[in-house]
Amino acid sequence: MESRNLLRQLPAVDQLLQHPRLKDLSRENYKMVLALTRQVLDDWRLKIKNGATTIPDPGQLAREIENRYHEAGRSSLRPVINATGVVLHTNLGRAILSPAARAAALTAAGRYTNLEYDLEKGQRGNRYSHVTGLLKELTGAEEALVVNNNAAAVLLALSTLAAGRETIISRGQLVEIGGSFRIPEVMGQSGTRLVEVGTTNKTYIHDYERAVGPDTALLLKVHPSNYRIQGFTREVTTAELVELGRRVGVPVMEDLGSGFLIDLEAYGITGEPTVQAEINQGVDVVTFSGDKLLGGPQAGIIVGRRDLVAAMAGHPLTRALRIDKMNLAALEATLRAYRNPDRAVKEIPTLAALVALPEDLRLRAEELQKLLTSVLGSRARVGLMPTTSQAGGGSLPVTELPSWAITIRPEQGGAAGLVTALRRTDPPVLARVQDDLLLLDVRTLLPGEGEELARALVQALEGAVHGGES
């Protein structure tokens, strides 16, 4: 009986639409306001049927409709503050572009460009010409090609060089590359026949040698950029595989995945070969990503032997997988920075974050601690602690990056509730929880985000206190 009375007390749609809060919105977009009004009323009818004992008044209902209207008008793709310490966070978009790359992409987006027009000859040009020269210069390869991501680069290479024939690969390199996409599945889609050799932890060059036959089209090496097998292991070296390929007349291809263009060993980052090193060892085709360790836009980069890359450029898949003008412009600007490695490390945000020294990170953390202590006041205790960052993005899996984190201990509520509340602030903040402390790793905080972070924490702490840890 009570639920029927409550249902009757809900205002009619037409009545609610006359509320002053909704009149202006209705003039702006009547269909959306009407749909949201019906949605809100339906939601409350369901709540009443499920046991709700009170209902909001018309003003509160109108406010709920208004809030949903404004939320629906916001972009779904939003900036977030990354305080996780994961530099190449796949779920947060991986690499942050340099100022030069952002400017180049913006120009390409807002102006006509000579994307496929040869200004000297006055005729159709080649879109890849804007980056192929740079890639050849930086890697030492004979030829280069760019598609829209590295999985596409692998698919194109296998489809061109090995469709209908055999590709030999070590069992220990049959990796999953993220999003449930696995190397064997990509290989199967290309039309090549997978020939597995060796075991998960040990593969020798004679395993490859015994598998080579008249139908062998390719010797494939996949660099394990997102994992490491340690202990009782044996892996075929690049030099061994290249020597075998030369001896039997079969091309060698390597999927580097991440793809460094400069050696960062001086900064303590090891275990990731550079593209140049693999080309210099004689690998015929190398593929790698643009938006991982390179620090550029999403792209799949192919470098290697002139005849093999030229064959890929002429494959029908190339058009389906081609890179767009904005990413191409950003990639060109990113590659230009690599002509001066010292400049690249400073200007490309991914590299700058990876090589940041612990002592510099501590200074940044101390400055941020002062700001947050002042702003948060009695809402939380703010501290500092050493922590460890990660490269992320399926890169440098065993490399630990010493860092510093701000710690937040709320005076009311716990860190679990706070980390949830931070995801709902504007902008959202992504952080970690450890021992009931909220950790904000300064390695992945961008310049100028301190004030935004402080405001978000105030908003989240008040929300966490009032809303609990739900």
UniProtKB/Swiss-Prot annotation:
Organism of origin: Moorella thermoacetica (Clostridium thermoaceticum)
Name this polypeptide is given: L-seryl-tRNA(Sec) selenium transferase
EC number: 2.9.1.1
Gene that encodes it: selA
Residues bearing the modification N6-(pyridoxal phosphate)lysine: K292
Family assignment from sequence similarity: Belongs to the SelA family.
Function of the protein: Converts seryl-tRNA(Sec) to selenocysteinyl-tRNA(Sec) required for selenoprotein biosynthesis.
Lineage: Bacteria, Bacillati, Bacillota, Clostridia, Moorellales
GO cellular component terms listed in the entry, alphabetical order: cytoplasm
Reactions that this protein is recorded to catalyse: L-seryl-tRNA(Sec) + selenophosphate + H(+) = L-selenocysteinyl-tRNA(Sec) + phosphate
Enzyme class of the recorded protein, top EC level: transferase
